[in-house]
Amino acid sequence: MGPALGAEASASAQQPGSDTSLYARLGGIFAIAAVVDHFSDAIIRDPIAGARSANPALRRWHTRQLDRLPGLKFMRTLWVAAVSGGPFHYTPTRPGASNLGLEAAHASLRISPREFDAVAAVLTRSLDHFHVPAAEKQEVLAAFAAHKNEVTQGWRAAQPGH
């Protein structure tokens, strides 16, 4: 299945200046779901953000709440499909200050900037696993990085003197 995503994304990619959505260039919902599935499983094994994390909230989530992982994979897939220009609408399960609700969804996990960066590295490896072309990979990673402040807001709020 790995090369299929890269082949689909390459086949659907347009020349620079095209108005083809990132969703289409990634290969659509099935290709996005494959990457999200791989990515979600890989986070659990990550030493910084996964089941052995120094962060007790992340460690607890990745060891005691894995029954929620299928739903989280669905929500992540829906979120990526929606924000990449696909024909889907994402509604956060915990609405927050932003329309995506990322700060509310992640606040109790107190994700640090280092942990966020570790998850970004996991995402990079998942995109590489599926041979996502460089341009699309950079768009996905930039979109992910754009939400760092929202995702790490709970950690920042818990810091002394904040």
Where are these regions (language model features)?
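Core of compact, soluble alpha-helical bundle domains
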Residues: 2-162
